[in-house]
Curated annotation (Swiss-Prot):
One GO term (biological process): mitochondrial translation
Major localisation: plastid
Gene of this entry: rps16
GO terms, molecular function: structural constituent of ribosome
UniProt keyword annotation of Plastid present: yes
Protein name per its UniProtKB record: Small ribosomal subunit protein bS16c
GO CC terms of this entry: chloroplast; mitochondrion; small ribosomal subunit
Cell compartments where the protein resides: Plastid, Chloroplast
Keywords recorded for this protein, A-Z: Chloroplast, Plastid, Ribonucleoprotein, Ribosomal protein
Family under the similarity heading: Belongs to the bacterial ribosomal protein bS16 family.
Pfam family, one: Ribosomal_S16
């Protein structure tokens, strides 16, 4: 099973995260299938590869709660409903 989850990057006390599609059995810093976004909680910046995220969601990938909140804040689910209708 594939999940969309955060992968920690950055320096000590200055964490930034990549949003990645990764196998559920892999560890947090393990090998990812594809990088689909970027999230910086300190600067509150988000960069998303929307077509890649929609592709993985359509294939059955489950976002973690934090990634789900990031995607909802970016109004990605409204866009997904608009594309599917």
């Amino acid at each position: 099973m594939v999940k969309l989850r955060l992968k920690r990057c950055g320096r000590k006390q200055q964490a930034v995260y990549r949003i990645v599609a990764i196998d559920v059995r892999s560890r947090r810093e393990g090998r990812d299938l594809r990088k689909v976004g970027f999230y910086d909680p300190i600067k509150n910046q988000t960069c998303l590869n929307v077509p890649a995220i929609l592709y993985f969601l359509e294939k059955g990938a489950q976002p973690t709660r934090t990634v789900y909140d990031i995607l909802r804040k970016a109004e990605l689910f409204k866009e997904k409903e608009r594309i599917l209708s």
